[in-house]
């Protein structure tokens, strides 16, 4: 009997140790996985940095990944997040259509996904979709571009990736304004896939075919910087350039007279707000907000460029 009692006490002690271990795990910081198209691109890098800073401030562990606009790699990274038992995923996705299945996969196992910058072509799958008011921002940029062009002359439009809804929305916003000016004439419209090197090469070619151009309006700042490099190399510093994002590079180009304007979309704030909503959802089971949330953009010109730093106006 004494032996049985000792064995029972030992089993109870082991059970208590196991429970204590579970309690310790429960107190450990939960994991927030942050996935963006790139960690090297300044815009996406600031998204990741902003999300990471806020998540750590709120007590979460973090993992940062980039999918390189590859939907298959994005799906693999979602699998990694699932395998690591992530509490939530902050995602700037790899395509409106091609990302739906990946977001649904996370949802199916109970991991909420909070989208930033780019929306997907479905509702009710992501817990939140926090995007810039791309149409409003594009109209701001186009108005500044028209003014920089003196409301007349031939111009070029550089468009982003066709799979990214932001590219089409920004282009429509540009033309909502520019098409109202009868003396503005678009001589070329090409996709440079958000790439600085592609924009550089394409503007070089466009200059050979259309040396008369007076302006370049670009769907993001990376392409704008490629255009500026090509224009400067050709001795065409007289060509007006307007970008979209609010990067430090284009800020400096504006201050140096190499660009007319850019449009600031609040990358840092979007990412931090996504983490705040994720934390609220994990604590309360709801965000208290609509799924799609839109943040207005701001025009950056020489008048306020000095206040711009890391995609935020100080």
State what each model feature region is.
Residues 43-57, 137-141, 165-184, 198, ...:
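Short, solvent-exposed amphipathic alpha-helices that sit
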Residues 61, 97-136, 144-147, 154, ...:
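Flexible loop/hinge segments that line or gate small-molecule binding clefts
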Residues 158, 162-166, 177-178, 269-314:
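Hinge/cleft segment of the Venus flytrap/periplasmic-binding protein
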Residues 74, 130-155, 169, 198-200, ...:
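Hydrophobic alpha-helical segments within soluble ligand-binding/sensing domains
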Residues 1-31, 104-111, 314:
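Short, low-complexity disordered leader/linker segments with a strong preference
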Residues 31-54, 58, 62-80, 84-86, ...:
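Extracytoplasmic "Venus flytrap"
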Residues 91-107, 174, 192-252:
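Hydrophobic alpha-helical
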């Amino acid at each position: 009997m004494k032996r049985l009692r000792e064995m029972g006490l030992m089993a109870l002690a082991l059970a208590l140790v196991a429970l204590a271990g579970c309690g310790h795990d429960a107190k450990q910081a939960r994991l927030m996985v942050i996935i963006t198209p790139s960690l090297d691109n300044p815009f996406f890098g600031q998204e990741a940095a902003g999300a990471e800073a806020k998540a750590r401030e709120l007590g979460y562990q973090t993992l940062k990944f980039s999918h390189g606009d590859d939907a298959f790699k994005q799906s693999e990274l979602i699998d990694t997040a699932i395998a690591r038992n992530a509490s939530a995923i902050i995602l700037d996705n790899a395509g409106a259509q091609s990302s739906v299945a990946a977001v649904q996969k996370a949802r199916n196992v109970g991991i909420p996904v909070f989208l930033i910058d780019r929306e997907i072509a479905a509702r009710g799958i992501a817990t939140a979709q926090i995007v810039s008011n791309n149409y409003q921002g594009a109209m701001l940029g186009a108005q500044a571009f028209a003014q920089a062009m003196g409301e007349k002359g031939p111009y070029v439009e550089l468009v982003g990736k066709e799979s990214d809804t932001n590219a089409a929305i920004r282009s429509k916003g540009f033309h909502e304004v520019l098409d109202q000016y009868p003396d503005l004439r678009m001589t070329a419209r090409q996709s440079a896939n958000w790439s600085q090197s592609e924009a550089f090469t394409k503007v070089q070619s466009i200059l050979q075919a259309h040396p008369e151009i007076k302006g370049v309006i670009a769907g993001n700042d990376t392409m704008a910087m490629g255009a500026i490099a090509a224009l400067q190399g050709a001795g065409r510093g007289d060509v007006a350039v307007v970008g979209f994002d609010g990067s430090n590079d284009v800020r400096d180009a504006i201050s140096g007279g190499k660009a007319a304007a850019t449009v600031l979309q609040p990358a840092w704030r979007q990412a931090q707000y996504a983490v705040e909503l994720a934390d609220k959802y994990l604590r309360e089971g709801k965000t208290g907000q609509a799924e799609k949330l839109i943040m207005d953009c701001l025009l950056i010109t020489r008048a306020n460029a000095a206040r711009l730093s890391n995609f935020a106006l100080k």
